[in-house]
């Protein structure tokens, strides 16, 4: 009786055999708590925000009349706030709002996000205005993302290496479930409502983040014994990024992410040339959301213990080669094989989503395992911002290639060449796989320290860590303040 009284309500719910099964299998061994529920809720909301993905794409294409190159450039610039994640992380670590470092920023994120979608619904009428609101909405999601990242990293620091991947797979799943719920609706709603109405509906969901923030377990800054100092944080981060175990993998990931994307051009091809309707594109989103879960499951079950170099090398090669299957659709070779455009696109999207998900999971694990305690939000945000910068470059370079090759709203003669260039370019970083650690960098650092206790060396002894970034191939992927650009830059699928 005393034991039951000492348990939290949510823990009691997981005390029966069935609930224990759900804890071990559904929560992947993570202990249930209100804070975990809040974290999963925030990622779930970010998945739900995919409701507006197709609406934004069609709004920019049809109502604002942007060209493929212009859309790509606008989307890339709209993602610029994600480059500021270190600043946002530093602010959350050192500058509390209303007495809190995490809750208050989640409140701000939710309110800004809702306001941004309302502006889309009622105000935006030009490319310039769209760019400004994209920046604003992007900033709102970036704020929430860096905060929830820090919460997950703080929890992950307490986990053993044996459980690496479990929490990030769980949060991946939460976002994917949100995406699945709204995937089909994202296209179906456009059959019934205008894009602006869809934006107004989307404005409701960021408010759920505001509610979830109240479940975060956080001590008020007024009760803190030690106050974080910005200068001290910056010094710690600078010391960390100078270590080869952090710097070299970051350089590789940057080069890997910065290869060009052809997604905007391919979106125009599927809608203007192939005649894909919003309803069908919603179905594609539905099956790819499920495929994303399959990719996470495969990584969690079979691949999470593979060395970084092995999984990154093979997944990059396989993703690049499979991405070339898009040429079959572009050249209409599938029709000669008796396969309808819709069915081929659907099957191709499933395969490419699974491989893309598997390719990016080890990047997230590696990034999080490089985060020392005390500066989790700031350093992880710095690593993600480098990836985001590479993602912006990827889209901007892709837009330039689209323009140079003369791919427009109706001219797709050079689209096949564009897809070949973007896919094969993903192989360019492979000669630099040696920049990645051969094994777990934390284990290696610890071993070296034990062998040379008096030698400070140039490495940090880092604690176990893992984290979720709800991105697939491309650091900006699946950011649902915009169309899902970047997730398929190697595949260039819709």
Swiss-Prot record:
Effect recorded for residue 259 to C: Affects 5-formyltetrahydrofolate transporter activity
GO annotation, biological process: 5-formyltetrahydrofolate transport; folic acid transport; methotrexate transport
Effect after changing residue 309 to C: Affects 5-formyltetrahydrofolate transporter activity
Keywords from the named record: Cell membrane, Membrane, Transmembrane, Transmembrane helix, Transport
Reported effect, residue 155 to C: Affects 5-formyltetrahydrofolate transporter activity
Effect of residue 369 to C: Affects 5-formyltetrahydrofolate transporter activity
Record keyword Transport present: yes
Name of the protein: Folate-biopterin transporter
Organism this protein belongs to: Synechocystis sp. (strain ATCC 27184 / PCC 6803 / Kazusa)
Lineage of the species this protein comes from: Bacteria, Bacillati, Cyanobacteriota, Cyanophyceae, Synechococcales
């Amino acid at each position: 009786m005393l034991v039951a009284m000492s348990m939290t309500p949510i823990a009691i719910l997981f005390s029966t055999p069935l609930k224990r099964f759900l804890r071990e299998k559904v929560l992947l061994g993570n202990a249930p708590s209100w804070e975990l529920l809040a974290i999963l809720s925030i990622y779930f909301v970010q998945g739900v925000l995919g409701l507006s993905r197709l609406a934004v794409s069609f709004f920019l294409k049809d109502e604002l009349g942007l060209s493929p190159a212009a859309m790509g450039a606008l989307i890339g610039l709209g993602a610029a706030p994600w480059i500021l994640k270190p600043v946002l992380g530093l602010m959350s670590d050192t500058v509390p709002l209303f007495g809190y470092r995490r809750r208050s920023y989640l409140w701000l994120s939710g309110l800004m996000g809702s306001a941004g979608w309302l502006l889309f619904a009622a105000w935006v009428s030009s490319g310039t205005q769209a760019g400004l609101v994209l920046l604003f909405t992007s900033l709102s999601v970036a704020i929430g993302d860096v905060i929830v990242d820090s919460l997950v990293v703080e929890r992950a620091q307490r986990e053993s290496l044996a459980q690496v991947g479990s929490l990030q797979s769980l949060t991946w799943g939460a976002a994917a479930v949100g995406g699945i719920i709204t995937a089909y609706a994202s296209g179906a709603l456009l059959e019934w409502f205008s894009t602006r109405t869809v934006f107004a509906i989307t404005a409701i969901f960021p408010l759920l983040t505001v509610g979830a923030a109240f479940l975060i377990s956080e001590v008020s800054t007024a009760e803190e014994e030690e106050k974080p100092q910005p200068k001290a944080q910056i010094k710690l981060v600078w010391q960390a990024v100078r270590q080869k175990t952090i710097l070299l993998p970051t350089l590789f990931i940057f080069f890997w992410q910065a290869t060009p994307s052809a997604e905007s051009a391919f979106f125009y091809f599927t809608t203007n040339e192939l005649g894909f309707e919003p309803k069908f594109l919603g179905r594609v989103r539905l099956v790819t959301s499920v495929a994303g879960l399959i990719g996470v499951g495969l990584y969690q079950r079979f691949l999470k213990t593979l060395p970084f170099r092995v999984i990154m090398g093979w997944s990059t090669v396989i993703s690049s080669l499979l991405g070339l299957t898009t040429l079959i659709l572009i050249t209409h070779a599938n029709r000669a094989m008796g396969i309808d455009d819709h069915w081929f696109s659907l099957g191709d999207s499933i395969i490419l989503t699974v491989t893309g998900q598997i390719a990016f999971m080890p990047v997230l694990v590696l990034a999080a395992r490089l985060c020392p305690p005390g500066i989790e939000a700031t350093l992880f945000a710095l690593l993600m911002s480098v990836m985001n910068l590479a993602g912006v470059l990827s889209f901007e370079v892709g837009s330039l290639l689209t323009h140079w090759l003369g791919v427009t709203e109706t001219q797709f003669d050079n689209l096949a060449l564009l897809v070949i260039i973007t896919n094969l370019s993903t192989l360019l970083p492979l000669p630099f796989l040696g920049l990645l650690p051969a094994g777990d960098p934390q284990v290696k650092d610890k071993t070296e320290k034990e062998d040379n206790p008096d030698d400070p060396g140039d490495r940090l002894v880092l604690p176990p860590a893992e984290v979720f970034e709800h991105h697939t191939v491309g650091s900006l992927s699946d950011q649902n303040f915009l169309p899902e650009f970047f997730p398929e830059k190697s595949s260039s699928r819709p």
